[in-house]
Each structure stands twice: as C-alpha cells, then as structure tokens.
Amino acid sequence: MRCGAMICMAKTAEIAAEFKQVCEFSARATWSNSTRAAQKVIANIYEDEKLLARVNEERKQYRDMLVARGRAFEKSAKEAGLEIVPFDSGFFASIPCPNPDEISRKLEKEGIFIVPLAKGLRVSVASISEERCAAIPFKIAEAMK
C-alpha cells in the first residue's frame, strides 16, 4: 500500500549521484510508512472473518504466482549457467555481478530493464510474466560473457 516515484534531472553526474544516494535513505522514511487510511483498511479486514478469508485467498494466488515466476527464473538461470542468489520467495531475483552498470546498460538496449546494485543485478519477478522470467536469465548470462 505504498507508492512513490522520483525522477532526477541533473546537470552533472555528481549531482545525480548525490540525489540518488540521498533519496535511497530519505525516501524510505517517507514512503515506507503506512498511511492512516491503509492502516484503517487493514484493521477492517482483520475485524471481518469472511473478508479476511477472501483477502487470504487473493494473497495466496499472488504469492503462488510470484513463487512460480521466481522458480522459472531460478530454473532458467541454472540452465544458462547464471549464478544467482537462491530464490526463496519475494518480488526480486538477485544476481552477483562485478560490473552491474555495464551489464544493465547492455540489457537496456534489448529492452530488458534490471536494477544495477553495488555488487549485482536485481530483476523484478513481480513485474514480468513467468515466460519472461524463464527467458531473461539466458539474456543476462549472454550479456555477462
């Protein structure tokens, strides 16, 4: 129940880097806190057993979908010889990578948008189909050669 986006338009790379670093920390304090309305919705759900059952069923469907996507990514990564951080559950798959910015730029040219981190790459399995989760590890492995 959180949402936020920031865009940096800076004249220099140094200013952009500073903006990114500041936002990584300050945005968490602002955008990661639940709002009063969201807290009220959660309270209402937990007060109604039927509604809670519906929410739990819906949550299970999404969780199962995310796990299936992660497993597809994990299986293809193994087939492609791509080392990844073991996937248990969640929204992201992580790949150790010594040059994440370079690999990210290469993949962008192919329409694959991943997040470069300090020591690796992060792929959002939450934002792409299971089929794409199965295909992307091969592209990443190729880009890392």
Predicted regions and their residues:
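PLP-dependent class I/II
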Residues: 1-145
